[in-house]
């Protein structure tokens, strides 16, 4: 189409790959214009064949980063996922693959199996241009991939914060839809992670995972109806005489992040007093 021709003219091919150390990096188009200002999220047969041919030169078991625009396996707003995800997964089955996508302005990790993980990464511009958070409540930012040989770690880097900023805690009364709870948004969560809490220094176990609209996002939109909910929220119900709540997030790599809030007066909004980063 016309737009792709212009891209070719000034930048080059839309599909390309290269190696950095032991990592094979692929960029693949998955937005296809169908006319009348409409598009579909799909990988064409020709592009899928190109990917298979490209990977035929890569040793099986290699670490592969696949960059695309639209999400592939999101559970939230899955109607926007790539249509032919099964064919893509089959083409990738012999490799250790991290699929890096955007499009949604929403952060979601999708673990398909031990060898295939999608990071649908929040946008640097947040929920379209004027917001400091994405639609899931994740801060504006980007994902940092640290590679040593074929070993990988990743961390979400929020703009305006250190890389230790990995969660946002809402004290009791600070999330309008959950007034009795302490709530935490852990944007880089996946099922291998843990979100635990302590009340006045006593371990209370894991927090309850639930789905709701993030408070920071809701506030940025005037708490209007119909906002997108997020699945990486967790809550705990403090006792009536609790003085402090500590949240501990253990990430995919066993790194721990801790944040404490005081509950000095149930009529006063909670004050955050500590954010200690790694243990």
Which residues does each PLM region occupy?
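Short acidic, glycine-rich surface-loop motifs adjacent to enzyme active sites
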Residues: 55-76
